[in-house]
């Protein structure tokens, strides 16, 4: 009996360790970063719609809701959307898969944001009733015109030192490191990359919430 109980506790501890701790958890999103070993499957999520950001080049398999398994070749910085019933990611290409899964807690929205507020060089990756996802690249020593973000998750693929000038003239310095996964409140600003490295960020803006931090 004691041996069985010890084995049971070991199993529980292994299961707990296999589920990554959230990098971000608030009333809008749960964001988890995970490394999936070759031939393994990502940990169970919360059964929520999500945007998944890939952090390395890999081959993965997934099963869409009610469909057959499909194989995808993904690149670092690629993002896919999955509904609540879409299957988990499997590292099917012989290499590990590093990813950030951003679960969306809102009920969704019929609003279409499009490119509203975005800087001209931002690349809109996709938008639906749950999220707007876009790619940000700011070369070292360059500036962006004034633009506006909603509340968002930022997944940093190349870190940099940024300086933001707000509409009231105040200045905020922001240091992003490669690998950061952070929550940022909505803001309007002019951005300047004052560092020596290019900034590359994926922004995931959840929908279905009233404006505010």
Mark where each language-model region is.
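Positively charged n-region of N-terminal signal peptides that target proteins for export
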Residues: 1-4
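Bacterial N-terminal signal peptides
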Residues: 6-15
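A short glycine-rich, His/Asp/Glu-containing loop-to-beta-strand
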Residues: 21-55, 117-144, 151-154, 204
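Short beta-strand His + acidic residue motifs that chelate non-heme Fe in jelly-roll/DSBH
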Residues: 42-44, 61-62, 82, 86-93, ...
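Glycine- and acidic-residue-biased ligand/ion/polar-headgroup-sensing regions
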Residues: 47-65, 149-168
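Ligand-binding loop in jelly-roll beta-barrel domains
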Residues: 57, 84-105, 159, 186-209
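Short acidic-glycine-tyrosine-enriched beta hairpin
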Residues: 66-84, 170-186
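Surface-exposed beta-loop interaction hotspot
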Residues: 88-137
